[in-house]
């Protein structure tokens, strides 16, 4: 089935179809989240962090930012299967986070297949460098940074953290991070992908459309190297964890196939390397928690996850934190 479907159209055409579907869902999600957004959060839209191609960040801040000291900053990498999405996709959620006393920076990056791995990681690094250089202007504490992401964004965030904290991985990847490991206080990961080889080989076969989608997304992101098992393993976050990896807050829905195939195995890898992990999973919940459930703020589990995220940032940003 996969071969037949893929033979009908190119990866480029297929990913455009997938991106259109994802963007429709994203727009609905954005409008729903806007209902929960506090009205008086300060927003700086479309601040350029890279000139060619021009890419921007949005910065969300509490209304009393001028009276506050430099604050912890959550740098959010949006999802969309590496082929779609927008930095505005969860703006209501970012306002909720900012209203709790943090900076939130949402990063724009280029999409596959026009821009393939590792372009997105390089662009995240450029964004972090920009924030570091302009920290004073935006009340950012450059030593209290958090990388956050949902879905493919969680993949990018977790991968960047591995490059930052594993010098061998960075060297073989020819990657020189702009920040130091001690500056990254933690990761916030929702519904992510941490093992690309496993992602390709555990897509539910009974759901042919999902299997077809996984095939095309990975082909797009990797430059059509989906069949190269060793390459997929070599760029999987789970293969490069060390005890120096930052503290992790990780969540996934009870009806998201990625929870069982990606998030839970990743938690085990983190624990094997003595990485501090805060988990937010709800296997016994009666709520139907699908992919990206954390943005569905009308659900009790989503509210709990949000509250625990705030606690995670507060606890890990204390001066006594050593990671």
Regions found by a protein language model. Give the residues of each.
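Alpha/beta-hydrolase superfamily serine-hydrolase fold, recognizing
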Residues: 8-323
